[in-house]
Amino acid sequence: MKYTLTRVNISDDDQNYPREKKIQVSDPTKKYIQKNVFMGTLSKVLHNLVNWGRKNSLWPYNFGLSCCYVEMVTSFTSVHDISRFGSEVLRASPRQADFMVIAGTPFIKMVPIIQRLYDQMLEPKWVISMGSCANSGGMYDIYSVVQGVDKFLPVDVYIPGCPPRPEAYIHGLMLLQKSISKERRPLSWIIGEQGIYKANFNSEKKNLRKMRNLVKYSQDKN
């Protein structure tokens, strides 16, 4: 996924959402190759350092919709110890949070509230969709439930399950950290390019299928 952020125009129609305009940009790594060795290496090291700090200090927004939220907060207990990943600091304000977990059923009445909370979060920000209800509406194929959070918010990681176990939430957090480590974001609003680059990752289903095929091939060969 490649896009750039543009300043929000308050006079825009509120029906257009999300307000950020997404424009395709090229992979910045190609431009690094064209630079000299010193500047290219310096830029790469600087981005890696910033991404390392971002992915190891992800503060979640204390927000839940249904039973999946119970499983999410269970990961904060001493049994699972999510502080190992630097995400034990729950924030009561979206302005102090780095990512939002949609844990539960997204009802139509909650959509404008969720969108407003998302708009109050500062960049960089990410969204995790946790559970079948948040991913696709789950068993609620009715008029009052939105069939997937990605209908009104950009989602970075999907966590399957009804409800997912705390281990699944931790695994989703690790996938988000992996995605952040490959991102290229502006170092400042006045330094460098303002484009955002996100690497494309295969689904875990494809990765596991590939691993199973490799194991099966090695067993057949032996």
Curated annotation (Swiss-Prot):
Obligatory cofactor(s): [4Fe-4S] cluster
InterPro entries per UniProt: NADH_UbQ_OxRdtase-like_20kDa, NADH_UQ_OxRdtase_20Kd_su
EC number from the UniProt entry: 7.1.1.-
Disulfide bridge map: none
A Pfam family it matches: Oxidored_q6
Keywords linked to the UniProt accession: 4Fe-4S, Cell membrane, Iron, Iron-sulfur, Membrane, Metal-binding, NAD, Quinone, Translocase, Transport, Ubiquinone
Residues holding [4Fe-4S] cluster: C67, C68, C133, C162
GO molecular function, one term: NADH:ubiquinone reductase (non-electrogenic) activity
Family: Belongs to the complex I 20 kDa subunit family.
Description of how the protein assembles with itself and partners: NDH-1 is composed of 13 different subunits. Subunits NuoB, CD, E, F, and G constitute the peripheral sector of the complex.
General function of this protein: NDH-1 shuttles electrons from NADH, via FMN and iron-sulfur (Fe-S) centers, to quinones in the respiratory chain. Couples the redox reaction to proton translocation (for every two electrons transferred, four hydrogen ions are translocated across the cytoplasmic membrane), and thus conserves the redox energy in a proton gradient.
Name the UniProt record assigns to this protein: NADH-quinone oxidoreductase subunit B
Organism: Buchnera aphidicola subsp. Baizongia pistaciae (strain Bp)
Source organism phylogeny: Bacteria, Pseudomonadati, Pseudomonadota, Gammaproteobacteria, Enterobacterales
